[in-house]
């Protein structure tokens, strides 16, 4: 029997067996989940009548499906998926929505879904489904039986997804008993830590004797942990009365058998013993999760001593399922740790257990050819790092590919997987990230007996992080099958199972729980409040206003509709600005990038920006007025246009004069030392040129107006002024270009041009080996000589065009002259392109070197030219078409002249071939002749090559001169473009005046006035030409062409824009005045001789307002009691708009009369007044902002008042640390940065060098696990909303081993967003303290943004809350 027939018979037998099974109700090794009968009326039968009659004496197998509308459709037996099958006719259908069937609806739907998944479930599910007839009733009998999972464990777990029909069946059949303890709980971080702490609290007195090899004394709670860890390793925990985790039992409803169920894995069995075999949960090891700084390292070392590899296992092997091979037992404990604390581990081992043999494994790539794992067998502890394991995965057998052929070079294999470690300890396991990372995959592959993950913060961001720990522990089968079992717990919210899983696996003590045993020195949390300096305050206020404008805060003072990312960005910028104006990418960009500036430099930059903006706004105002004049000139109101231009002329001429004086003084008088403050930051020459162009427009337009008014005298006067100014604008480029042209004219005369020698023909005859080569040469030499003539022709044309004089040197060019000059420029451009390509062709023919770039550029220019010709043909521009066709001929001429070196070979190639032919010649005559031709042609080739190089140098001079001409015409074009009429929308009369009587009247008056003037102008022209055309028709035609409605519409827009621009000018004028006064007081330390506007006396102590006015302190305080606006300019004043000027000329920000000091938060301590005074009096050499200065002063204070103080300075932003480092360097504070490859060296130096006062830490520096107990001070540079990041920093010093009180300082800037953030942070701390936690309940403990600069990630609700509080200080006037 062939294979096809056999398969067909087997398939038919399988179908028959499956069909017959539907008629069964009892199955061996199965649990009957349910068995029901559905009684129906015979009248619903839709199948064949004869089959219905047959049912009276027999039973009939059916399958059924419940559709989305809850209607049951029954069919004859089929293996097809009913929901997808077409053309299936049901035997009968039933609406299950009727009350009669409500009790059976759930099991019917479950049966239906299970049958849909039959192909996947048929090994573990047995179906019952058949119909019979009894009297007038049609009876549907249906049921489900579940196979004992021990018979098909893999099928069971693969079928048990959280959304699978099999899981729904188990949940329906084995409904766990209601447990009030779990009913009100959710699976979250708090639940996990609660489980861990419950286990810790349940540990009783430890009966562990002290090992003499351990040099340190264990605290009572550490002894209890040690005993628990030892028990986890040496026992199976499961007694005869216990079930493994995740299992529970219940009694069968159909018999007296006990059933054991595991919902998570999808297991069901009748034997308690089989539960251990299916999923015992009996891993040896667990998760040690004591709070940071509680001595987990010592607990692990204690375990190493107290529980070692049994002697019976020494020199024996075991089979490891993961690596799939036998591996020898090693007594060693493998400790895997972050590289940042690896040296710390080594020193701790040496300190606490010096007798143990330790080996530092640096990975296969660094271990000097270590190939054998024998060295591990003799060690007690082997230490390696995550960074080394990251590459180790590449050297595991299970990771390498199977090759078809044996490799010549066999890569070394990692020795880590060649032994079965007695114990693996993964320290700071939360840093392994995901189970898919290389480090996690490598740890998973390492054979082990016991495994521990150690972490004070096992949850980094969410509960799902715990899966990674289970993966490292090889908690089977939890980590298998694509997290299916784990997702069961999370998605189905199986709280009881979650607690069952982690309740015995994780142990966690908090400092609060064992406070009496721990006896750590007290920790003081101190709030260090400061205020922004006046410069920083100005910048902060600007940022607030920008944020409010960007987020549309002033519309409804709400942020509900704002984009979360925009809010996040602004909150970050505001927080960063509290540290320094340049912190963060956004703030740094706003200040032009570059290195961190001192506060004085920040002030100068702000002043420069204000000056630039003020100047630009003034130019815009004048430019818009000029356009208004152009509109009036267009509508024939010449006098109005002339009046506007004449009015604008005065301030523009004044601005030009002032700039000319500034430039003159900078150049000849004081060399820029006494530059007026109002001109800081301006590129004077560029600004002067822009003002010149503006003034040129005014002169030109005034001259054109006088032309229209027939005033020849003033017309000529202003045209001359415009011409003189144009030459002034162009003076630099004229001088530069003229110089280039003069030098060009001197060099490019016939006598000095490169001479191109002709090549000579070869007359060699009678050659056999060299005959073909000589023929190729004679063809090539002729083409090179022909190309030479074309090349010289193009060079001569180029030189002629380049020597043409520039326009506007002596007099204004006519339109024709201007066009001719521009055409000459275009021709030069094309000639250069063609000439460069011809040179490239010649080089290729001589040396064989092909310049593909030049070829590409030439083809591109040719393509553009062809497209231009097509465009000209469409637009019927004959002149442009003829001109471009002329240029196209240049490209064609070059192509015709190109030597065909690709056919004959280059000269160098011919020379090489001749030499080869000479060497191959057998007769002396032919050898001699070949060598003679070789030498002659070689000499010509070398000469031609040198000539090509000289020609290329010539071309580079031509190109340089041409670039100079381009710059000249570019500037001339810019001036010409500035005189173009403004773009105007084309608006019809009807559309413009629609439903607006006022507009109609104004438009009519303009048209009437324009018509009168047009009529007069047309009549005068006709009189001069003696013509008699209908004047009225011409006037109407002109009026229509003038688009008067469009111009009037533009006029309205300009009038509106004018008021907006004037408002901005007033604002920036006030700001400039304000910043100028700040500069004089802060930078120049100038004595104030300004008079108080109120009392008319000289100001000694007073206030400066943000509008730039100064008042005596007494006068302004009295004034503000009755008014809230500036006495001078009526600008609204609030708590953020006035700054105190002391007698020492120092300027301070908001004082009590403006805002009052914030009361300190009672949840934090505060320094006494004397300490504050001493810190404030510390002198700094350079200021970098209020907060940075306060930190630097505080460090200097500690240096003066303590013996070798050690301080950890922490920030979430690298930029903050950068500016701190600059301040430290400037003020003699010795520091070291914990970053980069030298982290371990940093720690060693910080611990050993007494003079090293400060260690700076960044949020992304992976400082978890660091022990810095030699430090007693922690400076938190900014308040944090993520308490996990904060605790990571603080726990570096507040931990076991600390013998002195520790101090944590929070630096807060008053009346900024930081105040609200601190309040939120303290509230979070209170919540965590109540729960006895030191980690956040939600959010990522180390989650940061901006990979280069860090920064905590803040939740959306907190972002909005903080921003709203920050923006509240803005008034409507700030908008």
From Swiss-Prot:
<dbReference type="InterPro" id="IPR000330">
    <property type="entry name" value="SNF2_N"/>
</dbReference>
<keyword id="KW-0067">ATP-binding</keyword>
<dbReference type="GO" id="GO:0006281">
    <property type="term" value="P:DNA repair"/>
</dbReference>
<dbReference type="GO" id="GO:0016887">
    <property type="term" value="F:ATP hydrolysis activity"/>
</dbReference>
<dbReference type="InterPro" id="IPR014001">
    <property type="entry name" value="Helicase_ATP-bd"/>
</dbReference>
<dbReference type="GO" id="GO:0008094">
    <property type="term" value="F:ATP-dependent activity, acting on DNA"/>
</dbReference>
<feature type="binding site">
    <location>
        <begin position="290"/>
        <end position="297"/>
    </location>
    <ligand>
        <name>ATP</name>
    </ligand>
</feature>
<dbReference type="Pfam" id="PF00097">
    <property type="entry name" value="zf-C3HC4"/>
</dbReference>
<dbReference type="InterPro" id="IPR027417">
    <property type="entry name" value="P-loop_NTPase"/>
</dbReference>
<dbReference type="InterPro" id="IPR052583">
    <property type="entry name" value="ATP-helicase/E3_Ub-Ligase"/>
</dbReference>
<protein>
    <recommendedName>
        <fullName>Uncharacterized ATP-dependent helicase C144.05</fullName>
        <ecNumber>3.6.4.-</ecNumber>
    </recommendedName>
</protein>
<keyword id="KW-0347">Helicase</keyword>
<feature type="domain" description="Helicase C-terminal">
    <location>
        <begin position="1190"/>
        <end position="1336"/>
    </location>
</feature>
<dbReference type="InterPro" id="IPR013083">
    <property type="entry name" value="Znf_RING/FYVE/PHD"/>
</dbReference>
<feature type="domain" description="Helicase ATP-binding">
    <location>
        <begin position="277"/>
        <end position="476"/>
    </location>
</feature>
<dbReference type="InterPro" id="IPR001650">
    <property type="entry name" value="Helicase_C-like"/>
</dbReference>
<dbReference type="Pfam" id="PF00271">
    <property type="entry name" value="Helicase_C"/>
</dbReference>
<dbReference type="InterPro" id="IPR049730">
    <property type="entry name" value="SNF2/RAD54-like_C"/>
</dbReference>
<dbReference type="GO" id="GO:0006974">
    <property type="term" value="P:DNA damage response"/>
</dbReference>
<keyword id="KW-0539">Nucleus</keyword>
<dbReference type="GO" id="GO:0005634">
    <property type="term" value="C:nucleus"/>
</dbReference>
<keyword id="KW-0479">Metal-binding</keyword>
<dbReference type="InterPro" id="IPR017907">
    <property type="entry name" value="Znf_RING_CS"/>
</dbReference>
<dbReference type="GO" id="GO:0000209">
    <property type="term" value="P:protein polyubiquitination"/>
</dbReference>
<comment type="similarity">
    <text>Belongs to the SNF2/RAD54 helicase family.</text>
</comment>
<feature type="zinc finger region" description="RING-type">
    <location>
        <begin position="1092"/>
        <end position="1130"/>
    </location>
</feature>
<dbReference type="GO" id="GO:0004386">
    <property type="term" value="F:helicase activity"/>
</dbReference>
<dbReference type="GO" id="GO:0008270">
    <property type="term" value="F:zinc ion binding"/>
</dbReference>
<dbReference type="GO" id="GO:0000785">
    <property type="term" value="C:chromatin"/>
</dbReference>
<keyword id="KW-0547">Nucleotide-binding</keyword>
<dbReference type="InterPro" id="IPR038718">
    <property type="entry name" value="SNF2-like_sf"/>
</dbReference>
<dbReference type="GO" id="GO:0005524">
    <property type="term" value="F:ATP binding"/>
</dbReference>
<keyword id="KW-0378">Hydrolase</keyword>
<dbReference type="InterPro" id="IPR001841">
    <property type="entry name" value="Znf_RING"/>
</dbReference>
<dbReference type="InterPro" id="IPR018957">
    <property type="entry name" value="Znf_C3HC4_RING-type"/>
</dbReference>
<dbReference type="GO" id="GO:0061630">
    <property type="term" value="F:ubiquitin protein ligase activity"/>
</dbReference>
<keyword id="KW-0862">Zinc</keyword>
<dbReference type="Pfam" id="PF00176">
    <property type="entry name" value="SNF2-rel_dom"/>
</dbReference>
<keyword id="KW-0863">Zinc-finger</keyword>
